[in-house]
Amino acid sequence: MTAVQSFIAGGTIEPEICDGVLDFYNTCEYLEKVAGETSQGVDNIIKQSTDMAVPSWIKDPRIVKYLDAVQGGLSLYIEQYPWASMADLEVLEPFNIQHYIPGACFSQPHTERVGSNKTSSFRHLVWMTYLNDIEEGGGTNFVHQDLELEPKKGLTMIWPADWTHVHHGIPAPKEDKYIVTVWESYA
């Protein structure tokens, strides 16, 4: 059997919007930065990042511009895959701005809908945006699709949250990596 489509789509968000999200991450004093978690909790062997969970109701203009851009991309995805919107979709949980130091990544193959967390069980689609360019490594590998994304500032990808899209990070040996991960869930 041959796979017909990957259901992975993408586009580019303006560099100024990425700079705004990165500035928010670096200057926000009311949201905490914590060790990145997996579905099993904090495990620095699997995921080495410093994450900031950002509620979607935050009205900071830097975040609003980013979420508006992401929602515009969702509309294009739905045009391409109309059955992806069989039910209402919404960003129900805080999204993550993540910082990986050189050599760090989320190395374990994983999906975005896993574990016993009831919130994650409603996830339908995943967004990921690279906030900075990386010269070497730092991409994302999709196991079943044999696809490796190169990290370019503003590159924003969307894909289904389930087992069909197992993926993992690739370390950037010399540079910091910043990404945003957003989950569209059944509302």
Residue ranges and their predicted role:
Residues 1-156, 164-187:
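Fe(II)/2-oxoglutarate oxygenase catalytic core
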